[in-house]
């Protein structure tokens, strides 16, 4: 009886693991291992994001990427650039500027941990996006919860139609 239970449990684990692997490979599920947003498993939705939502964003959605060295782009197992997970901090009509304290201000309200850095943690130079900017109807401003996040501070506004809303399923 015990062996039968072990076999059944093993089959359940294999089945659930296979389903999760298929969903991750199909890019419906996102496994986040960075500190930009909470680490864990996220679900990608085909829904237009709004301010306060998290999004999955490809690098080509941003307006200022020509200066970025290739080593900034992590790749998946198929060699494709991995998209980022970021928080929508600003949207159509919002004004984004740099405050006196160095933090990004969105409509005059400071965003925590948002001061652009001159260098990353590896000592490589970073180029802050030129502010102020008022976001157009097709743009969103994406930030990270981490002071070291690589986001709109350096890459500019992102095209909203290239972004997918992402919701956390299991984070830690």
Where are these regions (language model features)?
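Short small/polar-residue motifs
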Residues: 28, 91-96, 129-130
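Short loop segments at secondary-structure junctions
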Residues: 60, 93-95, 146
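A generic structural signal for residues embedded in beta-strands
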Residues: 57, 98, 142-143
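Residue-level recognition of short, solvent-exposed, well-ordered loop/turn junctions
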Residues: 50-51, 91, 99, 135-136
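Structural motif
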Residues: 53-55, 94, 139
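Beta-strand-rich cores of mature extracytoplasmic or soluble domains
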Residues: 103-172
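Protein maturation boundaries and topogenic segments
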Residues: 1-83, 132-134, 153-172
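Mid-length scaffold segments of soluble, non-membrane domains
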Residues: 79-113
């Amino acid at each position: 009886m015990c062996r039968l239970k072990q076999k059944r449990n093993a089959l359940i684990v294999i089945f659930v693991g296979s389903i999760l692997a298929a969903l991750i490979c199909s890019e419906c599920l996102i496994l986040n291992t960075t500190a930009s947003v909470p680490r864990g498993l996220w679900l990608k939705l085909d829904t237009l994001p709004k301010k306060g939502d998290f999004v999955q964003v490809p690098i080509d959605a941003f307006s200022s990427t020509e200066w970025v060295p290739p080593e900034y782009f992590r790749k998946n197992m198929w060699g494709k650039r991995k998209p980022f997970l970021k928080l929508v901090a600003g949207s159509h009509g919002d004004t984004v500027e740099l405050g006196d304290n160095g933090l990004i201000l969105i409509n005059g309200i400071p965003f925590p941990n948002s001061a652009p850095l001159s260098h990353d943690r590896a000592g490589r130079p970073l180029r802050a996006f030129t502010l102020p900017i008022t976001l157009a109807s097709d743009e969103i401003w994406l930030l990270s919860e981490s002071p070291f996040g690589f986001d709109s501070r350096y890459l500019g506004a992102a095209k909203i139609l290239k972004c997918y809303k992402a919701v956390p399923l299991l984070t830690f």
